[in-house]
Amino acid sequence: MTTDTLLSVKNLAITFSTSKGPVHAVRGVSFDLGRERLGIVGESGSGKSQTGRAILGLTAANGKITADQMQFHDLDLRNLSKRDWRKVRGARISMIMQDPKYSLNPVMTIGDQIIEAYREHHKVNSQEAKRRALDMLAAVKIRDPERVFNSYPHEVSGGMGQRVMIAMMLIPDPEILIADEPTSALDVTVQLQVMAILDDLVRERGMALVFISHDLHLVSSFCDRVLVMYQGHVVEEIRASELDQAKHPYTQGLLNCLPKMDGNHAELPVLTREASWAEA
């Protein structure tokens, strides 16, 4: 997959104002993103989701973003107006959230929601929009697109709901897809099915994928490159195929805490942390 740079982030920092003082959620994160699959991994609170949200301008109101650069093609994402953001979000950069129950509108049919997402960025009539929506539902391996099109979110399973979310986010044909733990609420079998669908669509469309996860196995299987985050910092950047050769002790510790499938039932080690890792 070509790695021509689509997005360049330099020295990104995110600080939240709270009643107990400032919280530094992201500190000095830098990376370039081409037409590839980039994984961002780390424990809860490491700053990985906030990094993804900052790319789309979705940081909460009490958060302050600073960066030396956040460049998407010729657009400076640090200085976009609300009007310009509406042209970027969904159309050029999309984001899949963790659980479709909280992302889909419970009082609209699935078809109406996908059509709305498509017509927001494309001036087409209702018949063409419906045709595109049904095609997109078929593309995410839904066997009966017409039935799901006319269903409400509560009438489909978790795995089906996540396929619907993938369809909705991809129908505008964005260049970058940010997937924030898109399978964490699903069982393992459905998880792999959804990831395989997502992987196929990203490859076919020549898109860039930012896959945010705490699951090292999943990231190593589906990504080209990995950023490992700890307390707001990127402590290691490594090719996914070489993850088992990680050099940073934090990444090594995460790998050592994974259960092995070789019959060794020894007690898993406790992950140790050094204060210096958060000062990098």
Indicate where each model-derived feature is located.
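Short catalytic/signature loops enriched in Gly
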Residues: D4-T5, R37, R143-R147, E237-A280
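Conserved structural motif at the start of ABC-family nucleotide-binding domains
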Residues: L7, H24-V26
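Conserved ABC transporter NBD signature motif
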Residues: K64-D76
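A short, proline-enriched helix->beta-strand linker immediately N-terminal to the Walker B motif
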Residues: I171-E175
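Helical segment within the ABC ATPase nucleotide-binding domain
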Residues: L192-R205, H217
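A short, surface-exposed alpha-helical micro-motif characterized by mixed small hydrophobic
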Residues: V219-S221
